Amino acid sequence: MQDSYYLMSKNQFQDLYNDNSIYFNDESNIENIISCENVPFGSTIEASNNFDSNYNCNNINNGGINSFNNSSSIFKSMTPKKTPNGLKNLNNNIPTVNLAPISENVSTDTLNSQIVPSFQSNNIPQQIPSSNNNNNINNNNNTISSNNNNNTASIPITTTPTVVNNNNNNNNNNNNNNNNNNNNNNNNNNNNNNNNNNNNNNNNNNIPISNSCNFSNNLEKSTPIVNLIQYEQQPQQNNNIYQNNDTSNLNNNNIVCHTKDNENIETISSNNNNNYTYQDPNYQDPEKVQLTMNCFKLIQYCSQLTNLTKQAFSNPSAAACELETLSTMGNYIQYEISSLKSSLVKNLPNEAQQQQIRLQQQQSQQQHQQHQQHQQHQQPPTNIPQHINNCNIPRSPFDSCVPNSSYINSPLVANDFGYYSPNSMMNNNNDKINSEQGVFSSTISSPLPINSSYTSPYIKNQNSPQSKVVKKQLKNSKQSPTYINLTENMIRAQTKKQKKTISRVCVNCKTSDTPEWRRGPQGAKTLCNACGIRYRLQQQQVPQSNLNSPRESYAVIPTCDENIKQQTSQNSTTNINSSTTTTTATIQQQQQQNIPQQFPQPIQSPLKMLNIDQQILNSYENNFKNQFIEKDFLLMDSFE
C-alpha cells in the first residue's frame, strides 16, 4: 500500500508556512488527538520534531510533551493511520524527574518537499528552534545568514527550558512559562525568561529561531535549515530541495532569518561561506519525475521512521500498535527502494545492446589494426648505418647470416620490432649490396648459399609456370617455421637422388631385364619371370609312373636354343659364380648324352611328396653336384 501525495501550489505553501496552529501546548489538544480514532498519516512526525524543543521540565505533570500535531495539512495522505494507544496513558506514565533532551540529531523537515542532501562532516551539535511564525511576517530577502554580529537574542543560562508559542489570533494566552504574544499589528514578541526583542525595521523582522535548552551539561542541538523552492508552472508540483549542508555552522546559538515571498531561498554557512544553488526539475520526462518521487518518499519515510523510533524510546508506555507502525514504515521504505531500483535498472542497456556494443568495439579495433599495418607496409625502408649491415642477427630461428646469400624483405614478415626492425633493415641493405656486386638474389629465404649445387636446379627452373605458382603461394603465406620447412623440402625433392638399383642376372638364361624376379632352386629372386614360371610348372607336372624313380627331371629347366647359345658365348668372355657354372655343366652333359627330356605329370596330391623315398633325394643330389641343398628347402619348394 502506497500513500498518494500531491504537489502544493504557491498559495497553499504560503498558508502552511504562516500557519502556526500546529504548535501548541494546550492539554486540550492532546485530548483531541486521543479522542480521534483515525488521524492522517504523518501527524506523528511533527510531534516528534518539536518534542525536544518544547520539552518543559517544569511542566511535567501537564504532559511533558506539548507538541503533538493535530493538523493534516503537512503530509497529505489517503491512508489514515490509527492513533497509537500508548498516548492514552501518556499523562500518567511520564517520570517526575528532570530529564535532559535526547542527544541525537532531530530532523524538522515539516514540509512536503523533496530533499537531496549532501552531508558534510561537521561535528557541531544541532539546535532545535522554537517556531515563531506569524501571519504578518514580511519576507524580503532571499538568503539565510548566520553571523556573529547579528545577535538579536540574549540567551540566559538557566536550568529550565522555555517554550515559545505563536498564535495567529490577537488573543493573549497567559501560560506558566510566560509565552510570547505576537500581534498582527505590532509584531512584538516579549519573553520574560529569554529577553528576546523582536525589532520591526521596515517590515524586516529579526526573528530568533534558536532557543536552546541550557542545562548543567550545556547540551545543545541544532536543526538543518530546510531550503524551499516554489514553482508556478503547475498548480500542483513537488518542491525540489537540494540541501547541500545538513547542519548549519552557527556561532553563539543565534540565527537571524530573513525571508522574502516568491523567491528562492539560499543557505549561507557562517564559517564556510558556501553558496548553494538549486536545480529545477524536468517535469516533461516521466522517468525523472518517478525517480524524484521515489527519492522524496524514501527520505520522508526515513525521517518518519527516525522520529517514531525516538518517540517509542522516550515513551515508556509504548504500545504494540506503535511498534507495528515502525515495521509498517520499514515496509514502505523497502517498497520505495525496490521501485527506485527498478526505475534505475530500466535505464541500463540490455544484454543484446551490450553485445552489440562489444562487437562494434571489436570491429573498430580490428579496422584500426589493419589500417596501421597497411600504413606500415606502404612506408619505404630508410637507410641504416653500415655497422648494422654486418651484424649477425638471424632473421628467424631457422635462418642465419651466410656469406654470398641475400634475403628479400617481405612486407608480410611478422617480427617483434615491426617493419623497421634491425632484421628487416639488414635484409634490405644486403639486397642492394648483392645487386651491385652482381650476385643473384633468390626469392626464397634459404640458409644455403646461392652458388651451392643444391639450389641450382631450383634457380634454373625459376621462370617456369610451376615456379611462378610457388612464388604466389609463398607471398600469400606468412613466415613461420612451417613456411621455411616447405621451401627446404621443395629444394630437397628436386635434388633427391634415386635409390641404388642392384644388377641382377637370371641364373638360367643370364638376362638382366625382366619385369619380375622369381624364386629358383638357388633361392629367391634368382630366376627371371619366364624361367621362374617354367620352373614352377615343371615342379607341378610330375608323372605318377616316375614317383618311385629318381627325380632327375626336377632339376631340368626347359630352355630355348638362343639361351643356350648365349650361355656358351658368355662363358668364354665372363667369369660366372660357381653356382652358375655347375648348372651349365649339368645342362651340357645332358645335351651330350642326348637324354630325352621327360615332362612329369601332375601329382594327385602334394602330400604324396612327403613320402618320397630316400633314393629320390639321393638321385637329385647326384644330378646337382657341388650344390648342398637342404631337404626341407626342397620339400617346401615342391609345394609351390
Curated annotation (Swiss-Prot):
The protein's name: GATA zinc finger domain-containing protein 12
Source species, domain of life: Eukaryota
Which species does the entry assign this protein to?
Answer: Dictyostelium discoideum (Social amoeba)
Query: Biased-composition ranges for Polar residues?
Result: 380-390
Give the Pfam families listed for this entry.
GATA
Spell out the molecular function terms from Gene Ontology: sequence-specific DNA binding; zinc ion binding
Per UniProt, which keywords does this protein have? Metal-binding, Zinc, Zinc-finger
Database matches in InterPro entries: GATA_ZnFinger_Domain (IPR052138), Znf_GATA (IPR000679), Znf_NHR/GATA (IPR013088)
Stretches the record annotates as Disordered = 121-209, 355-390
One Gene Ontology term from the biological process aspect of the record: regulation of DNA-templated transcription
